[in-house]
């Protein structure tokens, strides 16, 4: 073998080994500029995490990489405007973009699979270019962006969704079939239209400050359902049969109709309060049992749950209007010991309130001591939901 070949072949082998190693790294690879990103283009699969440096001012294009077996992180950068990955279809870690105040474009047209998405403080990001649609992710957390919609994120199954404080978002629509931990949509554009047409099963659902919510296929909730401060006039869960924890419908100022035609069981508390236009509650025709407290207050003239035969906790119904007939029906349940806890049912009060509240009658006198709570589990259920809202 010529002497030059004896030198060249080992050198070529070493270069090949070095190249292979450059696509697999144990430490996080930090991208300082566009050139660093271009240097990874020959890696169709990159094993390791990539971080974009806080001082980067270039647009970053991670073209060539089809699979990133790690995280993609960019944070605390006030200069970067565009992040793209034209060939990326799978990201096995987290896409974490936080505090990128000038970022206006995230372009990954082939991306479909991500372990988790976490976006926060992206005030100029109005849309996502996920043309192929991300349909697999375990967690989605999007807060404080300028997104107008979630077009491009169309998850089928998820552990956790938290979408909050996105003041411009007009629409949230996903093909979600089940939510194993929680879905929270809170404090976005108060007119946002929420559509979850395929959602059948979930653990916990919380909707706060939404313009409309559609869950036509929802059948089972293992946890709680909370509707707070929404703007819609009606809410329906036409196929929901059971709720594993609490149902809370609170402070929805335009709400005049609620319909749960197939709901038979609420394991913890039923709480309906401060919905000023909700004067009739007749949307629970099949409800048989409440494992915690029955707690309804407001301006109602009529409350009917014709098949209810078990309330394990306290019964509280307070209204500013006349509910004499309603109270007579529920007094019958109490007399038959089908309501196990304390009982309070009263109308024509100035300040109807939730259980534990001692209202003032329209004549100006107090109505008597408030009933104590006997359903500890029910109380814990509502406390947990309150904690979610404070998060």
Language model feature labels by segment:
Residues 2, 12-26, 387-391:
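N-terminal signal peptide
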